[in-house]
């Protein structure tokens, strides 16, 4: 999950888990669940449409600002749904990090952009321009095929977005083949 009992993933209670995953050479998939603020999003399927991307962004920011990528440098982590809103809010995160280090950089002195390429995201973003942006920002070697199957927002024909995105064959091959292998450590 993207949180555990509403605790961010950088909470002290979870450090033994991440240390064990790194020591055992395991891959970790972070998928949103139990979205924050659900009680305020009762209509229009907003927990699924707005809450899930926000929840994944929360998890990814917990990893970055909480120093988990530095603490566990060999840990292979993939964030579902293209990393949520992370890429779209990266400029804001960077700005917050630089203008309010007293609030943002308290557990990690490195800017959020320094972690681009340090984690994987899946391709399930439902939009070819967003997928292209992920590849541009993270690199094709950090985007893996995602479908969100069997959930209702899942891609009905897994791989359709990647195959019809206009990305070249080499990039598509990375998303379908070499990037997932690298994330899985095979």
Explain the meaning of each model-derived region.
Residues 75, 121, 128-144, 150-186:
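Mid-to-C-terminal alpha-helical segments outside catalytic/metal-binding sites
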Residues 1-138, 142:
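Catalytic pocket-lining loop regions of alpha/beta-barrel enzymes
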